[in-house]
Amino acid sequence: MKIVITGGEGFIGKALAAALSRRGVEVIIIDRTKGIEAKDFFDTVPDLHEADCVYHMAAQTSVFNTNHAQIMYDNIETFMAVCNACKRAGVKLVYASSSTANSPNTTSLYGISKRFNEEYARCYNPRATGVRLHNVYGPNPRQGTLLWHLLHDNPVRLVNGGRNVRHFTYIDDVVEGLIYAYGCNRQLINVANPEEMSVYDFALAVQMHNEAEISLLTEKREFDKIAQTVDESLFTVPLPYTSVKEGIRRVFDTIDNDTAQ
């Protein structure tokens, strides 16, 4: 079996690639850090190396990114190239969408770009499966995320008093959900931990392990949603989702193991 992963050096892509490799799958990684632009690759490679599936994980992933041109290129133009190439080659496409694509949650260009991808795939590649991911966390998190700051002992200031509620979903569960999507004939599914937790409680769960410095601010950002809801009209992959308490413990176990080596 042969799988192509765009963004295979990113937080989620790398975890997915490792899991597939452990299962004996041949993985081809397309990533900007390797000097390969996903859009260029899919614009020029007609047979997709006879892949069985393409996992499109490459994207600008921050709701804080205000570089509209960059988001348009990386999240929309590149997605269109990948989606079209998979349709031409008759190859299954699984792509990362986001909880921010759920209409009540869409308050940034990032969310708009993800919603566009869902609609584009629905119209032009109905075999594709989009996976709405919800606040993914785990060991070696992406730089600049809340968990990254907490793990690097950076003082963290939580807006809106830390009351914003999210469905923090552990990386291993996300990987299993993405693998499930390969054999799924639905156009759009959720991978979301059913456990709701405030951002403050998440930070406190981390603080129990490393005494991170946390302060609460009353201000609220314009694009913030107090509750990042899960669209219950969509199928949610039935997994034994990892509790946040257990997930954070695994994060620190990984740090301890890496330190000991």
Q: Predicted segment positions?
A:
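NAD(P)H-binding glycine-rich loop region in Rossmannoid oxidoreductase-like domains
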Residues: 38-74, 100-101
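Conserved Rossmann-fold NAD(P)-dependent oxidoreductase catalytic core, especially the SDR/UDP-sugar
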Residues: 77-111, 129
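C-terminal substrate-binding subdomain of Rossmann-fold SDR/epimerase-dehydratase oxidoreductases
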Residues: 158-261
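NAD(P)-dependent short-chain dehydrogenase/reductase
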Residues: 107-111, 115, 119-166, 171-173, ...
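Conserved cofactor-binding/catalytic machinery of classical short-chain dehydrogenase/reductase
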Residues: 53, 78-81, 92, 116-117, ...
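N-terminal Rossmann NAD(P)H-binding glycine-rich loop of SDR-like oxidoreductase domains
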Residues: 3-23
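SDR active-site strand-loop-helix element
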Residues: 6, 30, 54-58, 93-99, ...
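Active-site segment of SDR-like NAD(P)-dependent oxidoreductases
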Residues: 60-62, 98-103, 107, 134-137
